Amino acid sequence: MMKRDQNTLGRLMLDLEGAILSETERELLQKSSVGGVILFSRNYISPSQLKDLIAAIRESNPDILIAVDQEGGRVQRFRKGFLALPALNSIGKLYIRDAYKGRIMAEQSGWAMAAELMHYGVDLSFAPVLDLYNRKSRVIGDRAFSGSVEGTVDLARSYINGMNKAGMVATGKHYPGHGSVEADSHEELPQDERSLDAIISGDYQVFAKCVSHLAAIMSAHVVYPAVDTEIAGFSRAWIKDRLRSDLAFEGVVFSDDLSMGGVSAMGSAEQRAERALEAG
């Protein structure tokens, strides 16, 4: 489970340059403003190297949160020496054929992913994806369980249950829904042109029905013109009003990567971080 008190953690989550912690990075991780570090494929060579890297991180800051995107399918940062996890949509396809077997597979996948990461000292995988499947989405696509609210909620709860049994809390993403835009927010800023009713009755419903099972939520780098002109992670309407107030979510809200192409033009790194904090 989440071992750290979110109120005492620093607000920044940093990434690392390579597979070995540099002296500069060691010093950065000791700053009180830093509460977490996210690992990518460039930080991973082998299980033994990962153990050494995590030991070095913990030596610099024993209380820091260590996270990774280990969803399965095409988004799995640690591969060699780790289980090959299924894409969530393959679980969704099984669910269509046999709902019971789909739920079992979801729970087993969540447990296996979490148990393996925690064995190496990783606290969080940013999972599961709660976006609805839409074939036009390049960036989400088969990362999503299903195109239906009911199927996504059912499988997500089973997956989260598996994570929890292994001792890891869940982070739902990408609030309030990234699956209905074609553009990839790693490269450009997507706009979701759906009406507010369509958003609320779609992806948002998944978050609403799963919120009590989540310790954290990651926001989307997507603009929803039906609500405002801000990306969701900078939007008080989406974070403070709907997530914090309407859904009564008291957990951690992670912004998606603030160095991504979709937000890189929105001021300096410091300004982008401030805007995310101000949103709630």
Task: Locate the predicted segments by residue.
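A charged helix-plus-loop insertion that forms the helical arch/lid used to bind
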Residues: 82-100, 146
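Catalytic domains of carbohydrate-active enzymes, especially glycoside hydrolases
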Residues: 27-40, 112, 119-124
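Short, conserved phosphate-binding/catalytic loop or strand-edge motifs used
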Residues: 130-138
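Second-shell residues forming the walls of enzyme active-site clefts
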Residues: 14-15, 21, 42-62, 66, ...
